[in-house]
Curated annotation (Swiss-Prot):
InterPro entries: IRE1/2-like, KEN_dom, KEN_sf, Kinase-like_dom_sf, Prot_kinase_dom, Znf_SWIM. This is Probable serine/threonine-protein kinase irlC. Belongs to the protein kinase superfamily. Ser/Thr protein kinase family. Residues 338-368, 584-613, 885-937 have a biased composition (Low complexity). It comes from Dictyostelium discoideum.
Amino acid sequence: MKSNYSTYLYKMSELERIVNGGDVSSIFIEQDDVLGEIKNFNYDLYTKYDSLVLKDPQTQNNSPKPPSLEIFILVNLIALCGRINDKFPNLDKFLTHYKYATNIFNLLSENIINSIEKFKETLSKDLPSFQLSVIANSSIVKKDNSIIKFLSCFGSFMKLESIEYFGSVFNSLIGEEDQFSLDLLQVLIDSSNEYKKFLQILEFNQLQKYYDDGHLCLFHSIKFDNLNEFKLLFNDSTWCQQQQQQQQINPQIFWFILCKYNSSKIAHYLLNDYQINKKSLKQKNPLEISPVTLLEIAFLCFSDKIAIVLFSQFNYHELLPKKSKMKHLIKSTSTLINNNNNNNNNNNNNNNNNNNNNNNNNNNNNNNSKNIGLTQYTVLEGYFLINIRTRSRIAPFIEVLTMNGIHLTNDIIHTRIKSMSSDSIFRIFTEQYQQQQQNPLNNNQKQIQFNENFTRQQKIDFDNCPNEIDTFILDKTQCNLITLSQEFSIKVRAFTFYLSFGEIFTCSCEDYKREFSCKHMFFILLNYYHVPRNSYLIYQRQFTEIERYSIIMNIDLSKINSRIYGTPNFNTFFKIKSSPSSTTSPFQSINNNNNNNLNNNNNNNLNNNNNNENENKFKEDGDDEILQNLNRLNYILLRDFEFGPNDITTKLRETHINLFDRLLLIEDNLEALDKILKNFTQKGCTLSRDLVGDRNLLVLVAILDSTSKEKLSLLNKYWPLPEKTKKFAIPLIFFAISEECLKMFIQISPNLVKSTLNLHDWISILTEFALINETFLDHYPLLSAWYSDARSVETSLFRLFTCMDKIDCINYLIQTYLLPIPTFKNTLNNFETCYFFETYFLENSSIKAEQYLLEQELLEKKKQKEKKKQKQKQSKSKIINNPLSSSSSSSSSPSTSNTTITSTTPTTTTTTTTTTTPTTTTTTTTTSSPKQKPITPIKKEIEKEFEKIELTTPPPPLATTKQQQINENYDISIGKFKFNRKEENVLGRGSNGTLVFKGIWNNRIPVAIKQMQKMFNPLISKEIEVLITLTNKNCYNIVRYIDQEEDESCVYLGLTLCDGSLQNLVEKGDNNLTLTQFLGYDINSSSKNNSRLLELIKDIVYGIQFLHQQGIVHNDLNPRNILIKDDRFIISDLGLSKMEVTSSYSFTMHAPTGQEGFHPAEVLLEKRKTKSVDIFSMGCILFYLMTGGQHPFGDKFYRIVNILTDKPILEPLKHNLVACDLISQMISKNESDRPTIEKILLHPFFWNHEKKVKFIDASLNLFKDSNGLFTSKLNKLINYQEINLKNNIDSSSSNNNNNINSNVINNNNNNNNGMATNIPFLSKPWNQLIDQTLIEHIINKQNQLNGVGNNKKVIIYSFDQVKDLVRCIRNTIQHHKEIQRLVRQSPSSNGDNKQEVLDCLESQELVLSYFEEKVPDLLLFLYQKFKKHLDSKSLIYFNDLIIK
């Protein structure tokens, strides 16, 4: 050979180089060398050489198979064609350029094509798809003109499928057009007449199918607005033929597609040059459409670019209707035209339109004469669709309307069907669906099919479902259809609507009791709404609060007299996705019955179609999905809604949602809201002023977040916010439950703070708009008492905020209005401050006396009740202490006589003393001065619980000598608590004078009594509220709250008495019990997680999980707060636990009081505390427990510095890398990097052997994936690990008996900034790590499964590949019994460990343990690699095992 350039060409590595860049013909250095290189290249010798190379095990991985003979010749011909100077050469020019071209291949081997004619025959056959893909993709990506010249020369000889493949690559890679794409499209069109017809087809049913399948078609040019490409593909001759055959295609669908993609260039061409050309040729324009209809369709998709084109073409001020404020409709015109009529009909229609226009002009003149001085506004009314594509176009579209003086009105709706035009796009879709709807089922049929529906739905987990469900529990008033919303895509076959069940719906399952929603709602929906069988339901609840409220506000579905309301607590939303099996396109269905759709005279015959026409199921697909949904639900609700006799049918026709409501309440598109408000108010227009009603304002004011605040500011900018509601005339400031909103209204009108309101009206308006539920007043007893009073109750703003505990609003009013007053004292309590505020600022001072007297009345009733209760207790005490007295009264009361006989004990005096003390204390507390703060709701709840305890607690047993001794030892009695303050009785100490004593409750139950100073904790009621919340929950991993008492200076809490703490267990040993004795093994002697240790760790994790599920942050976790009870860990010291909500931020401002070193950097820097604080502390505690008392940030004196500088020291835990990986994530300095409590439980640290086997199976399935998810890059990643050179764990000292580098920690945190290096995970082949006896029989077993004979042995594993190691483990687990039998039958030899191998093959768990011992870090290594590098598609294999 002269050189080896051609040889390089046929190596796959060289093909990869071609793909990545460079011209195909650049492989040949000089043009003259092209022929010589091809002539001197022997293809046969090359293939024989490569086959020999492939057999060499040292080079087999680097020597892929050679390309096929056809691709070999094809690439050479592309290179030859690239040397021709003509832009579009043909075969003759090719032969002329290479005059020896017919003999080019004669010098090659006999198997190679020896002539051009034979090569043309080869082109007409199927070419290898993968190698053809390399050529097509590389040529089009590089925009290599050689491929254009090749197709120009030889495209006519290629098989149609090969040409279509080039078109598909064009469709997927080409976006905006350029000269290369146009030239390539031209040669594709010219290459085959058949393919040309394929490209220029205009039947929308076929276009939809081709586009969904990835073929090049007209939709590509429309999507990217490629005008020149559109001209090449658009051929309206087929439409002309269809017109002659009375199969005219409705142009509205075509324009709808254009508006969907906002293709303004194509629209401008069709409205100008194309229209002029049709007129010059005296041809009918098949795309002719009314300008108003076209603007309505553009509005439907918010096509701002097309709107600009339309306003440049038409004068819409003459076409659109006009409105005025006083006279509703000034001018109306026909907005749509009927394209089904012939030319004669069109002429007649034109004449009629002219007459109508004349009449309209006359009417206008008359109206104008009657309405002189009224301002008329040109308005646009229509429908809109908001989805991913259109959402960003709302603002620019409305801006275009505003610039052209077009006003939007409140008649712009989302889902109304009632007033649709006769031949509008909505009617086309809806009527067609009605024709093809299947016959609905009656109630009996539904009842029969309910169990089938219940078990047929594969998308729902049935494990927790009851066997029977009452299918008749739901009536019509409980099906509250809320609204319809949609995301559109031609390629995604799915539709969505949301349903909400009413408050009356109930279910007996546990899920419903806990969350007020359950899976059975799905089946009721299936049962009653006759959802198509090929649909399935997905539960969806991820809505913001403002979305939930706004959806509720739009309920208007029934004409029944009673209102139907839901609340956010009871709403359940459903998402229905359809994957129909039918291949019928919606466009095909429309076209097949187009005349019937558009003929208004056939409306009465819609349900009398032939059965054959109903066989093809309507395919719910594309941008018409919402329209089909509307009609489908409307159809079912009107004709198939049979919940009972005499029920008024729910009509979907009444459901609508206004565009303004959508932008104001649901969308977070502030720019669009600003544009629509600007449009509403341009030129002083007030047509839509009534859109801002009480409903909108109350939703925004009552649920004020960052977005709603800006929306209110925008409203106030264009339409000043009213001071009061329209219906009740209540000041809106009374609904401002946040400081930001309060400031806004005070800025609008400072005098609003002097307003008062009737509480009955306030509650009524909150109830009417579903802003509160039936349990609202239960949380505010004082409000409840006012509301239950028949008298008119007036209240002030300050008093309302005080009763509702709105501290931020109260503080703002104090700072703004009261602090500047010299006589105001900041030491007053809230009640006194309220009285002071009302004295100075209320306009109607008479309400002060009324409110004061009412509160005094409530306090007096409470005082009398307590006195009565105290007298009853004293009388019982006298009976017990004085038997004679009780005897004298026996005649009048037999029950008293019985009490006297059984109560004669020597300890009655003590009982009397302890009973009297708490009663006196309680009385003193509750009968305070009139100015004292009223009893809080929490106190009321506590007292109710106390009453329950007193009623249900049996009388104490007779006192014994031991009991008397206990009572004598506890010399202090506070209510039901008894204890003493001796040093040996102190269990613990905290900050601010907090002490914990050992004592008893109810004279017999041992408890820990926590004493807290009131002066240091004025918000102690908040802590009690948290404890009560936890007491009502069933959790065994936290300390239980028992009771609460108080005296003048302290509050006493009774808690579970525990055996000790983790700190004492580790550092001192509780009750002579060491940590080793408590665990049952030496924690420093094993690298494995002992089951006892794992259960104790889970105790801590489950306790924190419970708190976080309740929205509570402990905030002070440390070993001292991990207590021991019944040999388990429980969490204590919830004194700083707070609800994790914004309103309680002021209660978490104080620094934590726990030990140093167990709080993250954000706490040390006094930043906001979230649940991640507990995650950090728990990570430190787990390290403390697993290392026997050491800290992950070193010695006590350096911990704070190491925490702030993020320098953990994990060396003591190097023997347990799985735990080390988990803890390293939990103690990250960046709180966003810490896992949630749910993700912690999914970490491999908590995996049992079943999950580990599941992970191995999932890994193997990924390795065998046929869709290319497991790439060579990923294979390389799992064979190497990235080692951080700054790692705190010394890898050289790690457990590495098998020479495996165990340093896999920080794989998730490497930033590849030069401080990391890649080393093999396996430092030696893994077959050297496993017993040879085992590996030999594993291979033998696999050979048997693969059908290999006994005399042959095939090595089926690569021992340097991690994926093969995983495969070996999985195969051993799967066939462990068979392998064990083979090992048992094999002869023994000296030195082998046959018995050890047999033992490890007893079960899958033992097999897994064997491999974990041999390769200890494999699962963690793979887990980290997959979590870091896999995409969402690949993670599907792992389900819930890996969550990023």
